[in-house]
Amino acid sequence: FTPKPGTGAYSRVGAAGPTTAQTASVQGKPCAVCGATDPKMVADHKDPLVVEHYRTGSNDINKQTSTSAVQPHCRKCSSSQGGQASVFSRAMKRILGL
């Protein structure tokens, strides 16, 4: 993965979701990773915000707030992905010299 040259450090944009509609859309569905179900599922962006940011240089808020942009995650898989995203973000900062 090569980040878009000139991209600044990622800072999560709250407006990118998950929105109430996105969260509602994943309830009662199995986790896209492990198949588990939790009483409250997490709306996971199919294209993680941090990845989109370093690939394109920004986040497409309209795309990322649509219900089709998310998939269900259980809490365990969501937490695991959060750690992976943090490692990814640090690597992108090193590559970009940030």
What label would you give each PLM region?
Residues 1-98:
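Catalytic toxin/effector domains delivered as secreted proteins or via bacterial secretion systems
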